[in-house]
């Protein structure tokens, strides 16, 4: 039998698919352990710094949820890739970039201040939509990381609970 030499892109696709199956199997096993349905788990493919072509390879494996760390990359990808992709902004978000994210990201995972929540709320109201957000919590208390201390979360949620648009 002849040795088959794979083109680099073909090999990458095989590895991506293999890794995806491994991750999906790990999700199923973890869910079985804790009595949870795997359908309740959302697998988000983190696309930071990856080219659009690679995202399309994962997209072709029926993955529709993508997470991006950088605003400009998310904007470029969201505006040029298929519209059924669900985008998650998972990186630190600065208030001056909120206008680019609200309306493109289906979920903002990194709300770490009242001022950022206000900016998201105001932009969502302007665009007549609701922006889904998650609160970033710095559970390890690392100085170089963003997020609320665990004991600050409840107060933050109370402060923003009446904000429209989020």
Identify the function of each model-found stretch.
Residues 2-14:
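Short, Lys/Arg-enriched N-terminal segments with co-localized hydrophobic residues
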């Amino acid at each position: 039998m002849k040795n088959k030499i794979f083109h680099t892109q073909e090999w990458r696709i095989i590895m991506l698919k293999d890794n995806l199956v491994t991750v999906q199997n790990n999700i199923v096993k973890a869910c079985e352990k804790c009595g949870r349905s795997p359908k309740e788990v959302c697998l988000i493919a983190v696309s930071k710094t990856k080219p659009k072509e690679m995202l399309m390879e994962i997209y072709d494996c029926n993955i529709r949820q993508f997470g991006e760390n950088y605003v400009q990359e998310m904007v470029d990808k969201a505006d040029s890739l298929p519209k059924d992709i669900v985008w998650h902004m998972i990186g630190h978000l600065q208030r001056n970039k909120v206008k680019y994210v609200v309306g493109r990201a289906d979920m903002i995972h990194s709300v770490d201040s009242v001022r950022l929540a206000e900016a998201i709320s105001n932009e969502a109201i302007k665009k007549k939509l609701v922006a889904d957000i998650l609160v970033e919590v710095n559970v390890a208390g690392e100085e170089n990381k963003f997020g609320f201390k665990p004991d600050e979360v409840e107060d933050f949620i109370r402060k923003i609970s009446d904000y429209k648009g989020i």
